[in-house]
Amino acid sequence: MKSHLQYLELFRAHRDLIDAAAPAFMGAPREEAARLLEAQGLPDSRTERYKYTDAEAAFAPDYGLNLRRLAPQADPYAAYKCNVPNLSTSLFFVVNDVPCPAPDSSRVLLPEGVVVEAFSRAVHTHGEILQRYYNRAAQTDRDFRTGHDGVTLLNTLLAQDGLLVYLPAGAQLKAPIQVVNVSAAKADFMSVRRILVVAEAGAKGAVLLCDHTEGSQRYLTTQVVEVFAGDGAEVEVYSMEETHRQNTRFSTL
């Protein structure tokens, strides 16, 4: 069986569960993503942008997923550390693909109106922003020879939550927003992460994405980061990774 078919079967068998545990706006593009993924599958090394990475092979093993959106057992703000020397940051954690509620100390340096929040919580206060921008860039991500990017389609198919970073017009971050993604599970696990960065006109700031692993399990991550900048806005996005050889990560910006 081709790798993508097992995920299409999973999606169709558990569509109600996937949608029930996700904000409604995330369900809208799933059917189109399923149609395109079924038509073209996942890329292999014959696809130029995956010349050295066989996605078809990477997604073949049977990984667990958190479709019921169970919260991490440990408080990541107490259990994990990711310090960047000589750099003060506003720190936020995502464990596997669950954005974790942040303590007040993580927001001390954020200017008024800046939002760093899970889609599932931000939808109640910034639903219009999420509706307007979610999947807008991802749906145009494509390999010009084979069509849409299969890994991005798979992410859209299964993503149930994400992290919104919103900078209102004119906001200027005093320190970078640091998002620490931690893969931690008792069995081989697949994370489906989504990050949406929206900077309105004149806003300025930096986002630092850090990836770490716990334990010796095999981890597979598909991550899609969408960034939108208004007139005169400046957004810098950095990515750092400190993981082990059993970790495979597909990240699309």
Can you name each region flagged by the protein language model?
Residues 2-148, 152-153:
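N-terminal amphipathic, basic helical "cap/leader" segment at the start of enzyme domains
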Residues 122-126, 131-253:
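Conserved beta-strand/loop scaffold segments within soluble protein domains that form the structured core
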